């Protein structure tokens, strides 16, 4: 997020005392860069297997089993399977984690009786009440005292033995969340699956706190709930983390990523491989081209934060219509230095839905149907959000949200 909107923002200076992260950098997993195969393997065979180092105590066995899984992967496009349990009514019998894992495994690698179209099709369901929580869903608290890190959709085990784990985090105002915010994760998932050696094990929305000074910002608990409504019935891998929104002051993006690293890698020890050994999870920031361009503006982002975000974590950049992120990447010294840890995602179908324009449509009593999920539209109507707000013409015309 734009640091200049912090209420206590001061332009960064070389004499500024740096606040160390909660955990030392040595606790951030050091994985391979995110760059595509074609660049990473310029001097090696593209088809060469990528093996995760394992302890010697694990004997090599089940070769035939792993070979059959690999064949299953080749036949199907890499994707995070749709968990149909999410669409069961509250009265449905709760399944065990073993049952869920078995279902996901069968869906991932295919079976004789189930086709891909049956497992990935659009699910039909009725929403009787916005506050009716679907089966297996965890919603966020409204206070830091009651806060718990959401991990109900975070994979506990890697499915592909030749890939490394990755979690995607999107920071933003999400006022309101739109279909573009949802599509960004799907575009990132496709790019990572096709171009990298990583396996996505979860994705998070992290809405900013109310201290982020921007007109048109609904109260944080409304924005968190809208994000939950947008993804809890439509996704099997996206979650909403309210930690940033519950902070009493503006939280820098670098600190937000440190929070996810602490929760996933420090507290939970990472994720298990197919052998049962736990390894660290790479965490990456998902951002639009406008956020990256703000990183090039003088006296906005501290150099130390940029090095920390791009060097220790990495960034997935979704290009907007008309933007040229690659040229900007070439001209920015710090971003160019960490270019191997940045993956640019090109929109094959351009989508320029913006929260700013959605708020404008609502103020003008215009339809926002098909711009954001129906559950979010209903929530906005029930709570009369954005109806009586005003925004500067410059902000509306800028349309970079």
Swiss-Prot record:
Its cofactor is Ni(2+). Present with 5130 molecules/cell in log phase SD medium. Pathway: Cofactor biosynthesis; NAD(+) biosynthesis; deamido-NAD(+) from nicotinate D-ribonucleotide: step 1/1; Cofactor biosynthesis; NAD(+) biosynthesis; NAD(+) from nicotinamide D-ribonucleotide: step 1/1. GO terms for molecular function: ATP binding; identical protein binding; nicotinamide-nucleotide adenylyltransferase activity; nicotinate-nucleotide adenylyltransferase activity. ATP binds at residues 181, 356-359. The modification Phosphoserine is found at residues 91, 95-96, 111. GO terms for biological process: NAD biosynthetic process. Catalyzes the formation of NAD(+) from nicotinamide mononucleotide (NMN) and ATP. Can also use the deamidated form; nicotinic acid mononucleotide (NaMN) as substrate to form deamido-NAD(+) (NaAD). Key enzyme in both de novo and salvage pathways for NAD(+) biosynthesis. Predominantly acts in the salvage pathways via NMN. Optimum pH is 7.2-8.4. It comes from Saccharomyces cerevisiae (strain ATCC 204508 / S288c). This is Nicotinamide/nicotinic acid mononucleotide adenylyltransferase 1. The gene is NMA1.
